[in-house]
Amino acid sequence: MRASGLPARKSLRWAAFLSYGGEDCAAQILKELKMDNDTTDRVKTLVRWFSEELQEDDCKVREVMSSMEDGRFDELLLLKESLLPEEAAGTGRIRKTAEAVRSRGDCIRMRDMAVTGKDLIAAGVRPGPDMGNILQRLFLYVLKHPECNEKEYLLNMAVKKDTEE
């Protein structure tokens, strides 16, 4: 375990220190130390995912990337490489997968989807919780099938499903 190889960023260093205690333990310790909320949130995310086995599959990488803020996935990989050198080869392959996801422009944020709430309203979907559910369902679909992130395709999918319910 070599945390000394990490960049001198407060959240990364704290995550390395607290990585084996779990997210709840890290949150409690940082709260008692009166750590700022941004650092606490960053550390909790890193600690939560540190113990998870990441998969090289494009879909799984997109799902993990979408669950955290921009840049946090790269910090997670740095943390894993520093603290788990025996997994460095796998982490390197996951990094290449993440780079491929980014270079292709795969959608990993709901805001990057080809369809917005305004598009759904224009297509006849009523605003409200149901529209949020439709957007969430479309987003999960796009995470698994990034090639389907096209406005017409997603609108047809949303309207079709909305009329079935």
Which residues make up each language-model segment?
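Charged substrate- and nucleic-acid-binding regions of tRNA-handling and nucleotidyl-transfer enzymes
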Residues: 83-165
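Conserved, hydrophobic alpha-helical core segments of structured domains
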Residues: 1-90, 165
